[in-house]
Amino acid sequence: MGYYSDPTSSRDLLGNRTLLFIFVCAFAVVTLVQQILYGRNYYLRRYFEFYEGPLEFNSSKCLELRRGITDVKVLSMVKQTELFERWKNLQMCKWEINVTEANIFKSTLFRCCNAPAFLFTTQKNTPLGTKLKYEVDTSGIFHINQEVFRMFPKEMPYSRSQFKKCAVVGNGGILKNSRCGREIDSADFVFRCNLPPISEKYIVDVGVKTDIVTVNPSIITERFHKLEKWRKPFFNVLQNYENASVLLPAFYNTRNTDVSIRVRYALDDFESQQPVYFFHPQYLINLSRYWLNQGVRAKRISTGLILVTAALELCEEVHLFGFWAFPMNPSGIYITHHYYDNVKPRPGFHAMPSEIFNFLHMHSKGILRVHTDVCNCC
């Protein structure tokens, strides 16, 4: 007896085998592409899954990871996510200062800028009667009279490599929930930018110790009405920083001068012992030229970059906290612009990504350390 054979069954079987073959091939191709796309980072992640503890900074693996940062000469060479991935991997390496690289960098800064001699206007570098050119309004000149001359220190209060370990604290949202306060406060000298809040609410993340705090005259104009009427609120804010020196760009332009001088008068009125210093405009001009040659193209370099550069001359070892110029942290999680608010800066005024990119390079070379993870100090 004959059996009916469906002619489509063999075709279905063949079709199923073909689909299976296509699926297997597709899976193999996707896997291969994934490995090509992730490249070195794929294997690094696999390596770190089984690793317990930090790697030595000069180990062969860490040298490779450091090159992953330093080989990127221009920020636009890599996607942001790729840069973050390389930076995250580098955190597995125990950072240590490279004395040779740090000294070379300090020598370069000495030749161009010389913070130990010219960071502030002093009676030594700006004698009575000096016709001082403004940083931006270069056609404008301020004649150093007896009244202003008396406000200057006789000479720079700090010397080259005077402090062993310094912390420069930016105001970036990367500091929120960082628990870096104790590590910041353990530094021998602490720089802070633009009157940041250091109240009990923030102390665990940002600490409280302050040796120098900068004040942008725009803050005095907007928050304290140029100190023309009520000076007590401004004085009360400064008390949060105890005896920290107050540093202002009095000679950035003509508008800044009167406001900055009022700060000195306000503190005198309340018999405050806090020193008031003014940035030397020529130091800032030289510094801007230097960083322009390093690829930082902006209307003005940030206060943070100024303080970091000065710290590299005044301190043996420099640690940065709160410096991050991207909307996400290295793990890809969105963060606020500042640790205390999410107010964005004026677009195009500073070149923050370029500044941070330079810091990452310097970290990788052992010149300074950039902290972006949760701290485990003390």
Can you annotate each of these PLM segments?
Residues G2-C378:
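Metal-ion/cofactor- or nucleotide/acyl-coenzyme-handling active-site neighborhoods
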